[in-house]
Amino acid sequence: MFNMKILVIPLFWGLVTGYKGNSSDSSAPRLLLVSFDGFRADYLKSYDLPHLQNFIKEGVLVEHVKNVFITKTFPNHYSIVTGLYEESHGIVANSMYDSVTKKHFSESNDKDPFWWNGAEPIWVTNQLQENRSSAAAMWPGTDVPIHNITASYFMNYSSSVSFKERLGNVTTWLSSSNPPVTFAALYWEEPDVSGHKYGPEDKENMRRVLKEVDDLIGDIVLKLKVLGLWDSLNVIITSDHGMAQCSKNRLIDLDSCIDRSNYSVIDLTPVAAILPKINVTEVYDKLKRCNPHMNVYLKEAIPNRFYYQHSSRIQPIILVAEEGWTITLNKSSFKLGDHGYDNSLPSMHPFLAAHGPAFRKGYRQSTINTVDIYPMMCHILGLKPHPNNGTLSHTKCLLVDQWCINLPEAIGIVVSALLVLTMLTGLMIFMRSRASTSRPFSRLQLQEDDDDPLID
């Protein structure tokens, strides 16, 4: 009986401790978040990436991260650090127009806090904690005062700054800042730039580019080891989106369908944001007949699974090209690789790998959502997350302090254990009662001389 209780107690203990947050201690946990833009998930299987594979071998891998729609750079990077869908955090595209304020946003005009204040990214939350600071090298939005706060250490964005300089700054801040940097973010433009230029199916060029990216991952690990940070620092390597192969033979020419005087294009391809200048229905009807390889949605009819309706920055009409197709004006330009398509497409998915004291070793998981990364990071850092669309339980099997089992399964195990305990208890009671049952003649009373032999 006692031994069975010992077996059951850990089950209850695991159920309780598996859902508590990171406990605080004298040494606050630290986290480095790294994004290699446009790193498609299946590059891991298609190319030899020894540094990344060694990183994964000692840590965890999520093979596919389902990102948010639209699968563009600015929106997904903000979803990673807020845990919100695009309609909630407000960065709904790389180019935007707000119908209320009449303001415009673009990759070269992104410094107005108005666009970013719809959410609080993790570097701001971390920055607000006592005796902590944040740092960032080129991560989208980190050079903007969001809610009047920037990270203690950041770099104004410039694509001309080398990875070596970015990494050098981040690791210096991590190793010698006061108050200590407990959260840092690092961004690099490749393999996205080359994916657009060559297309993901150009094996020769993409092999070369991905080798360069893999070497950069090796540089990260080596730098952290040299500085004595490797064993104590949690490191997440991920991306914002994947890449689809495009072709000059798969073009959707809007000029062949509707006159440009009827509308303005806010963002073009592969998800075009259309602001009608005439009757919305008239523009919609013309675009609906334009090309069978393009879905046309009124804002209120955008599929719910995209979570892409409830924002004044989403235009009245949205065009979504099929995978590999390009929306153009007068067939003016196209790229051999592109992204932004339906986020259910595997070609749009990035991956996630992580290493450090917060993560298991040698564990692989098939999928999580981009919005799940934020609550996981908050848990690691001991931060209270803001309301978000992510789910911590989706990532718990990646973490050493989480019980890797679903709550219904845990309840089932405990109930099963109790049933076994009940059965064993009943069996023991039955056996004991049977052992004490009266034997034959046990009721006969022996006299003092009854033990004398019957025969002399």
Curated annotation (Swiss-Prot):
<comment type="function">
    <text>Hydrolyzes extracellular Ap3A into AMP and ADP, and Ap4A into AMP and ATP. Ap3A and Ap4A are diadenosine polyphosphates thought to induce proliferation of vascular smooth muscle cells. Acts as a procoagulant, mediating platelet aggregation at the site of nascent thrombus via release of ADP from Ap3A and activation of ADP receptors.</text>
</comment>
<feature type="topological domain" description="Cytoplasmic">
    <location>
        <begin position="432"/>
        <end position="456"/>
    </location>
</feature>
<keyword id="KW-0378">Hydrolase</keyword>
<feature type="signal peptide">
    <location>
        <begin position="1"/>
        <end position="18"/>
    </location>
</feature>
<keyword id="KW-0094">Blood coagulation</keyword>
<dbReference type="GO" id="GO:0030194">
    <property type="term" value="P:positive regulation of blood coagulation"/>
</dbReference>
<keyword id="KW-0862">Zinc</keyword>
<keyword id="KW-1133">Transmembrane helix</keyword>
<dbReference type="GO" id="GO:0047710">
    <property type="term" value="F:bis(5'-adenosyl)-triphosphatase activity"/>
</dbReference>
<feature type="disulfide bond">
    <location>
        <begin position="257"/>
        <end position="290"/>
    </location>
</feature>
<feature type="glycosylation site" description="N-linked (GlcNAc...) asparagine">
    <location>
        <position position="279"/>
    </location>
</feature>
<feature type="binding site">
    <location>
        <position position="339"/>
    </location>
    <ligand>
        <name>Zn(2+) 2</name>
    </ligand>
</feature>
<keyword id="KW-1015">Disulfide bond</keyword>
<feature type="disulfide bond">
    <location>
        <begin position="397"/>
        <end position="404"/>
    </location>
</feature>
<dbReference type="GO" id="GO:0046872">
    <property type="term" value="F:metal ion binding"/>
</dbReference>
<dbReference type="InterPro" id="IPR002591">
    <property type="entry name" value="Phosphodiest/P_Trfase"/>
</dbReference>
<feature type="binding site">
    <location>
        <position position="157"/>
    </location>
    <ligand>
        <name>substrate</name>
    </ligand>
</feature>
<dbReference type="GO" id="GO:0007596">
    <property type="term" value="P:blood coagulation"/>
</dbReference>
<feature type="glycosylation site" description="N-linked (GlcNAc...) asparagine">
    <location>
        <position position="389"/>
    </location>
</feature>
<comment type="similarity">
    <text>Belongs to the nucleotide pyrophosphatase/phosphodiesterase family.</text>
</comment>
<keyword id="KW-0732">Signal</keyword>
<feature type="active site" description="AMP-threonine intermediate">
    <location>
        <position position="73"/>
    </location>
</feature>
<protein>
    <recommendedName>
        <fullName>Bis(5'-adenosyl)-triphosphatase enpp4</fullName>
        <ecNumber>3.6.1.29</ecNumber>
    </recommendedName>
</protein>
<feature type="transmembrane region" description="Helical">
    <location>
        <begin position="411"/>
        <end position="431"/>
    </location>
</feature>
<keyword id="KW-0812">Transmembrane</keyword>
<feature type="topological domain" description="Extracellular">
    <location>
        <begin position="19"/>
        <end position="410"/>
    </location>
</feature>
<keyword id="KW-0356">Hemostasis</keyword>
<feature type="binding site">
    <location>
        <position position="37"/>
    </location>
    <ligand>
        <name>Zn(2+) 1</name>
    </ligand>
</feature>
<feature type="binding site">
    <location>
        <position position="192"/>
    </location>
    <ligand>
        <name>substrate</name>
    </ligand>
</feature>
<dbReference type="Pfam" id="PF01663">
    <property type="entry name" value="Phosphodiest"/>
</dbReference>
<keyword id="KW-0479">Metal-binding</keyword>
<feature type="binding site">
    <location>
        <position position="196"/>
    </location>
    <ligand>
        <name>Zn(2+) 2</name>
    </ligand>
</feature>
<feature type="binding site">
    <location>
        <position position="192"/>
    </location>
    <ligand>
        <name>Zn(2+) 2</name>
    </ligand>
</feature>
<feature type="binding site">
    <location>
        <position position="241"/>
    </location>
    <ligand>
        <name>Zn(2+) 1</name>
    </ligand>
</feature>
<feature type="binding site">
    <location>
        <position position="94"/>
    </location>
    <ligand>
        <name>substrate</name>
    </ligand>
</feature>
<dbReference type="GO" id="GO:0005886">
    <property type="term" value="C:plasma membrane"/>
</dbReference>
<dbReference type="InterPro" id="IPR017850">
    <property type="entry name" value="Alkaline_phosphatase_core_sf"/>
</dbReference>
<feature type="glycosylation site" description="N-linked (GlcNAc...) asparagine">
    <location>
        <position position="169"/>
    </location>
</feature>
<keyword id="KW-0325">Glycoprotein</keyword>
<dbReference type="GO" id="GO:0046130">
    <property type="term" value="P:purine ribonucleoside catabolic process"/>
</dbReference>
<keyword id="KW-0472">Membrane</keyword>
<feature type="glycosylation site" description="N-linked (GlcNAc...) asparagine">
    <location>
        <position position="330"/>
    </location>
</feature>
